Structures are given as structure tokens and as C-alpha cells.
């Protein structure tokens, strides 16, 4: 019988670990704080900020929202970020996306302190991820591997096919999987005969955002399938994988929703705590 990799269950365990780590920090006089910067009033961003506030406060992380108008100049946003960089009581900074068209996302991300970059998207963190250094990792690729490891699935020596080469999931996932001693193949939208490669995989991780991309005839019996794709259709969130068909062949599979996405918020909060350790290290 196919094993369903329950992201919600793993997220619950991670939340308890997070709470215990926060208790330990508070005993040392450290109150973890996350600052969120939101430009404009994008409904999905506003809703996520409210959700994040609830999750943060339930875990014991202080939360503050800095909401700026949609017309705020890029220079003003950068000034706000640099102010937060200088405040020692702020340990993590999250820049909500999307940004207005007049704002350069790359410029903004480059101004967030890499030690407070809970998204793990600063060039410093990207570089250290590639070189194997200590840094903050992006939450979604971390979630993909965490689900596997916490489910008792060995990564070392396995052939992992990553489908997707995006900056936030696919690319970092490749180097994170290599660090786990997996053999990694990368496929993407221009790959010819995608199934030729996925059929060779022990583990498939898809992060494209295209419904039905991974079908049953594209995997070998006994493969593990992790679906990190997100697509909204008729008010429902669906992934890249033809779940009902693939689960009949796969040894293990993540559902959407209830899989990879269930872990991302708590893993981002864990980055706040990891950032604290890095910040303390630079002060000593």
C-alpha cells in the first residue's frame, strides 16, 4: 500500500520543537521577533500576513507588520529594510510578494541582512547554500527534504529528479539534495521527453505549478513522489502530480494540500531562530 507522506503531522511535530527552542531562548533573555514588510494591499498577501501573525504568536515569536502604500518608492522600502536590519530586537525580516511593478525585487532582497533573511533568497545565502556553508535555507525546498527524512526515506545514494528550475524551489533544492549525497538530475519546461528522466528516478520532486504534469506512466513502480507544485483552480489548490493515478504506483507520495506546503511556515519561523544563532555568532 502506498504511504501518504502527511505534511500536517510532520508540521505539528516541528511546531512543538519550535516552541521548545523558543522557551530555551527566552530563558536566555532572547525574545524572537519577526518583522514583515508588506507593500500595497494584495488580498492574498494580507491574508497570509494575518495567518503568519497567528502562527508566530502561537509559537511564541513576536510579530510586527510594516505595511506601506502601493505607491511607496523603492528607496523608501529599502530605507525601511535597512532600519530593521539595524534593530537588534528584530531577528527575522520577511518581504511579502508580489511587489508593485515599479519596485525591483532583486534590489530589495539584496538589502535585507542575510542573517535576517528568513526567505533564504539573499545572494549571500544562495552562495553559501551552493558552497555548503552555514546559511538560511528557503522554506519550500527544505520542506521537500524534511518530509522525506522525517518519513524515514534515505536520500544518500538515491537518484532524485527535480522537475523545475525556479529560483525559490528548484535551484536551491538541487544543491540541498546534493548535500544529502543524492544523485540529482534537473528537468524543466524545455526538457525533451520528461518521462524518460522521471522513469529513472528513485525520488521525483516536482515544483513547476502545472497541474497533471507528472502522470502515472512517467514513474517507475516503487518511486517516491514529492509534489511541491501549487496551482489554484476553481478555488482549489492542486499540485503538479496526477495524485489519484500516481499513488497506485508510487511507494510514497505527498498530497496537495496537506503535503509540502504544510511545513513552509513553521520552517520559516525556524529560520528566525537559526538567524538568531548566526547573529549571536557575529557579535561574539
UniProtKB/Swiss-Prot annotation:
Keyword NADP recorded: yes
Binding site for NADP(+): 164-166, 189, 230
Family assignment from sequence similarity: Belongs to the tetrahydrofolate dehydrogenase/cyclohydrolase family.
Protein name: Bifunctional protein FolD
Signal peptide: none
E.C. code: 1.5.1.5, 3.5.4.9
Gene Ontology BP term (one): purine nucleotide biosynthetic process
Pathway membership: One-carbon metabolism; tetrahydrofolate interconversion
Alphabetical keyword list: Amino-acid biosynthesis, Histidine biosynthesis, Hydrolase, Methionine biosynthesis, Multifunctional enzyme, NADP, One-carbon metabolism, Oxidoreductase, Purine biosynthesis
Amino acid at each position: 500500500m502506498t504511504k501518504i507522506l502527511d505534511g500536517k503531522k510532520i508540521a505539528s511535530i516541528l511546531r512543538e520543537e519550535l516552541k521548545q527552542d523558543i522557551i530555551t531562548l527566552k530563558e536566555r533573555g532572547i525574545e524572537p521577533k519577526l518583522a514583515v514588510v508588506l507593500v500595497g494591499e494584495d488580498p492574498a498577501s494580507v491574508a497570509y500576513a494575518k495567518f503568519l501573525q497567528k502562527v508566530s504568536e502561537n509559537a511564541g515569536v513576536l510579530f510586527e507588520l510594516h505595511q506601506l502604500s502601493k505607491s511607496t518608492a523603492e528607496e523608501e522600502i529599502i530605507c525601511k529594510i535597512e532600519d530593521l536590519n539595524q534593530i537588534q530586537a528584530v531577528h527575522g525580516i520577511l518581504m511579502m510578494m508580489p511587489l508593485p511593478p515599479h519596485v525591483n525585487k532583486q534590489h530589495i532582497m539584496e538589502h535585507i541582512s542575510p542573517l535576517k533573511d528568513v526567505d533564504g533568497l539573499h545572494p549571500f545565502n544562495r552562495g553559501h547554500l551552493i558552497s555548503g556553508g552555514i546559511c538560511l535555507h528557503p522554506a519550500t525546498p527544505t520542506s521537500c527534504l524534511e518530509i522525506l527524512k522525517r518519513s524515514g526515506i534515505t536520500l544518500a545514494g538515491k537518484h532524485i529528479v527535480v522537475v523545475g528550475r525556479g529560483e525559490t524551489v528548484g535551484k536551491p533544492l538541487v544543491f540541498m539534495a546534493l548535500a544529502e549525497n543524492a544523485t540529482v538530475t534537473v528537468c524543466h519546461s524545455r526538457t525533451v521527453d520528461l518521462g524518460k528522466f522521471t522513469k529513472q528516478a528513485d525520488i521525483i520532486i516536482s515544483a513547476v505549478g502545472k497541474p497533471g504534469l507528472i502522470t502515472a506512466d512517467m514513474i517507475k513502480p516503487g518511486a517516491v513522489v514529492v509534489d511541491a507544485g501549487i496551482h489554484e483552480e476553481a478555488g482549489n489548490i492542486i499540485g503538479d502530480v496526477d495524485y489519484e493515478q500516481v499513488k497506485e504506483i508510487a511507494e510514497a507520495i505527498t498530497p496537495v494540500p496537506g503535503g509540502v506546503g504544510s511545513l513552509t511556515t513553521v520552517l520559516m519561523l525556524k529560520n528566525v531562530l537559526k538567524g538568531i544563532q548566526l547573529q549571536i555568532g557575529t557579535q561574539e
